[in-house]
Amino acid sequence: CNSNYTSKKEGYFKIDFPKKVYTTFNDPTFPYSFEYPVYARISKDSSYFNDGSRNPFSINIVFPSFNGTIFISYKNVGGTSVYNVKNPDGSYRDSTGKNSFEKMVNDSYNLTYKNDIKAYSIEDSVMHTPFNITGVFFKLSGNVATAKQFFLSDTLYHFLRGALYFDATPNEDSLRPVNAFLQEDMKHLINTLKWK
């Protein structure tokens, strides 16, 4: 009771990152391929509809040791998709819409900027890959749900969007090292993406 009080600084655990080694995702039924790290696993994404047939080319790249996932969604430019539309009573109904390139780009920006309440900055940078694919990479700063997002397209046939999420309460300081580490993997995925 008579000892001097010593304040304890807030700290975070040291994270030992694995060596960067990549393997190829090249499912013959998919319209794209890319390289991803061996410390991740691929799973089919049915989280939005509980029915993978509505979006059969959407996948998750899961990083179990980091409690993170890159959600990848794919759509055909000019094709149609089923969207959930909110009714006035709060329930949802299915609606079919055309996948125009402009609409998908606007949707990507809108999804990114939904984080502007928590973000204190949002940076976007235009990308051009070695395989003549263009897109935009978003870096968000602040306690946001997803600090890294991107979309890629050839503007005529293919459109792919990715967003990194963690199964944790957003805390920019504690997630910074893992966000930086997985950003390298996202950039590798982007630079190795090929359309089929």
Describe each region flagged by the PLM.
Residues C1-F17:
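Bacterial Sec signal peptide processing site at the extreme N-terminus
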Residues Y5-K8, E102, Y109-K196:
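Short, well-structured beta-strand
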Residues K20, T29, P56, A145-A147:
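Short beta-strand-initiation
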Residues V21-S33, V178:
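Short aromatic-glycine motifs in intrinsically disordered, low-complexity regions
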Residues N26, D45-N55, V126-T134:
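Short, ordered beta-strand-loop transition motifs
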Residues F30-N106:
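Secretory pathway targeting signatures of secreted, lumenal, and periplasmic proteins
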